[in-house]
């Protein structure tokens, strides 16, 4: 099974590398072309502990700027894009909206039945239900899986998670649990 990731920032990169270490084939995308080129060359500009070792020992991860490729080639696609806080305390989910729009645009041309989108970034109450409604016609299942981590200990926090929350039901639910037990 191939796992996709859209949003390969600090958290996304750590998560993708741990999923790869657990034995999955991973295709990770980000919209920052220079950043992806650096990752493809093995150049890493982060001080996050343990990431260098994970990147250099990885054998089955590929980096791209092509979200469409991730959506078409992968069965389960995690999105860990930025959702910054707004002044009113809510979250700006426009980056997640963009990912859902990518699914919709591809769904017009290519059947997406059986694929799952796992929203791993912080969202507002009700957002995942909205994303699911937008993806129903494409046959995509939406799960909510927020990460509980701190900058500077992302890898450690993912490996030693106090809890894992997976909201949603569908054919990939059990596989999501396996992924999380695999990275721990």
Q: Across the structure, where does each feature detected by a protein language model lie?
A:
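An anion/phosphate-binding loop that grips the pyrophosphate of nucleotide cofactors and donors
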Residues: 73-74
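N-terminal glycine-rich dinucleotide-binding loop that anchors FAD/FMN and/or NAD(P) in oxidoreductases
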Residues: 43-62
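Short amphipathic alpha-helix with an adjacent loop that forms part of the alpha/beta core around
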Residues: 67-70
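Internal alpha-helical scaffold of NAD(P)-dependent oxidoreductase catalytic cores
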Residues: 129-143, 154-184
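NAD(P)+-binding Rossmann beta1-loop-alpha1 motif at the extreme N-terminus of oxidoreductases
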Residues: 1-43, 63
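Nucleotide donor/acceptor-binding cores
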Residues: 1, 115, 162
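N-terminal Rossmann-like NAD(P) cofactor-binding module of classical short-chain dehydrogenase/reductase
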Residues: 77-78
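Rossmann-like NAD(P)(H) cofactor-binding subdomain of soluble oxidoreductases
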Residues: 84-153
């Amino acid at each position: 099974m191939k796992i996709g990731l859209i949003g390969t920032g600090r958290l996304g990169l750590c998560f993708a590398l741990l999923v790869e270490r657990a034995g999955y084939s991973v295709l990770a995308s980000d919209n920052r072309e220079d950043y992806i080129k650096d990752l493809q060359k093995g150049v890493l500009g982060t001080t996050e502990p343990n990431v260098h070792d994970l990147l250099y020992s990885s054998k089955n991860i590929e980096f791209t700027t092509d979200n469409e490729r991730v959506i078409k080639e992968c069965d389960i696609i995690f999105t860990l894009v930025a959702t910054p806080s707004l002044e009113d305390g809510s979250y700006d989910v426009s980056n997640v909206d963009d990912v859902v729009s990518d699914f919709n645009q591809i769904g017009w041309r290519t059947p997406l039945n059986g694929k799952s989108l796992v929203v791993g970034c912080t969202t507002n109450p009700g957002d995942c239900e909205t994303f699911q409604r937008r993806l129903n016609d494409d046959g995509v299942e939406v799960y909510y899986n927020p990460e509980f981590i701190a900058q500077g200990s992302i890898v450690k926090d993912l490996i030693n998670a106090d809890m894992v929350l997976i909201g949603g039901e569908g054919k990939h639910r059990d596989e999501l649990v396996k992924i999380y037990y695999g990275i721990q």
